[in-house]
A protein has these predicted regions:
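Well-ordered secondary-structure scaffolds
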Residues: 2-273
Length: 273
């Protein structure tokens, strides 16, 4: 049994789909997050443990830790440890000890925030901002469509178009961005059925209205200080799909499968084998 771990940078909803799959497959995973995560689909994002101490996604519990020494105890309990380490300092520390099997950058910032191939024996970047063979070993496509989850061995993913993928036949209309600067005060909650024009939140004194009728699939954390134009909410036009607010998306599951495929093809086996 290997004592090496998979480090995943980022704990948003897509990253959490990957992390959940890795954990279920028997890999030891360590999540690294920033101090103030801005996940929208917070009911399926392990990064919420930064605020609450723990976060559960489809029956798997993530626990915030303050030191690497706590990892073993959390893994032993069948949970996933998360540390606030936006610079990735512990990657260097663990790699120097030979305890990192692979590094997955799942921040999905549309650009590389500091991941390089020399950080781990195997490096994987999700989405645009990475070039396979240059700053990471592999890139996994994150754009919805025919090439979703395609494993790229040379070059970058499809550039960010700024247009959200289709959900229920709706694209850009389903995503809501902040109309102003300030602290957000939510008037609706995840999984609420909302009507077009309904006030979902206030950013400072400015109201944020629902762009379409549907299920509020996600909304940024209450009290978050948002800039103009930041994504703050997501509406699913399919009212009957309320349960989807609490489960990993099809997109995340597809990407997760490709990450596992890369690991296995490179001989990185689960810790349980």
């Amino acid at each position: 049994m290997s004592d090496k771990c998979i480090i995943v940078r980022g704990g948003g909803d897509l990253a959490s789909g990957v992390i959940h799959r890795l954990h279920r497959c028997g890999y030891r995973v360590l999540i690294l997050e920033c101090e103030k995560p801005s996940a929208i689909r917070r009911k399926v994002a392990f990064c919420e443990a930064v605020y609450d101490g723990t976060a559960a996604v489809e029956g798997i519990l993530c626990r915030r830790i303050d030191s690497l020494e706590e990892c073993g105890q959390v893994w032993q309990a069948g949970e996933i440890p998360l540390m606030v380490d936006p610079a990735g300092n512990c990657i260097i520390e663990l790699s120097a000890q030979g305890k990192v099997a692979a590094l997955v950058d799942a921040i999905l910032a549309k650009r590389n925030l500091g991941t390089s191939r020399n950080m781990a024996p195997l490096t994987i970047g999700l989405g645009p901002g990475f070039s396979a063979g240059e700053d990471v070993d592999y890139v996994v496509e994150t754009m919805r469509g025919h090439d979703l989850a395609r494993i790229i061995t040379e070059g970058p993913a499809i550039p960010n178009t700024g247009v959200p993928g289709m959900v229920g036949g709706v694209s850009k209309e389903r995503v809501i961005h902040s109309p102003g600067v300030g602290r957000i005060h939510n008037m609706a909650h995840i999984a609420d059925i909302v009507e077009k024009g309904q006030i979902l939140a206030y950013v400072g004194e400015t109201s944020v209205e629902a762009s379409i009728t549907g299920v509020l699939r996600g909304i940024i954390k209450e009290g978050y200080n948002v800039p103009v134009g930041m994504k703050i909410a997501d509406i699913d036009p399919r009212k009957e799909e309320k349960k989807n607010c609490f489960t990993i998306s099809d997109k995340a599951r597809c990407i997760a499968g490709s990450v596992v495929e890369i690991l296995l093809s490179e001989g990185v086996l689960p810790n349980t084998l």
